[in-house]
Amino acid sequence: PDKRPLKTRSGENVTLASLLAEAVARGESEVRARSADPESPTHGLDDTELHAIGRAVGIAAVKYADLSLEVSRDYVFDLDRMVSFQGDTGPYIQYAHARIRSILEKAGVEVPFEIESPALPEAPLALGEPAERDLALTLLAYPGVVADVARTLEPSRLCTYLQRVAAAFSVFYRECPVLKSEE
């Protein structure tokens, strides 16, 4: 990150198409490597599915990196960081989403593409573990975050929130094995 314009070794400017192609290649490579782990949501998928997921990861990594920056900060380009599955990155959030979908699928819960938010009846909610409470409180902040993003027109605030959700879910996933529960 030397803050100079992004150029190829030959001195040419880097095109968005070439940047996305490299991000897709790295995303696919990482997805394929992770699919070897039996615990991975991508384990057992065929080549076509792995390619599609790798493509989505690569493109979303670049988009997330762009949207996550506050407008007042310098733009520092680091493709390795962008496609990483750790830290404040799009792939980290996508991986959390894949984990959530995998849990729901294993539990036999079908989630429609679009979810309506009906008014829920008030009921006591017992959250016995700190990780459960933290995740619930983080999720409850969503309407306020969306209103704040709409008011300020700063998508970086939504990215920060999604990162917090993914991190809270990661702790919850590690500390509260819901599918192993007898309840």
Where are these regions (language model features)?
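Non-catalytic interaction-recognition regions
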Residues: 1-183
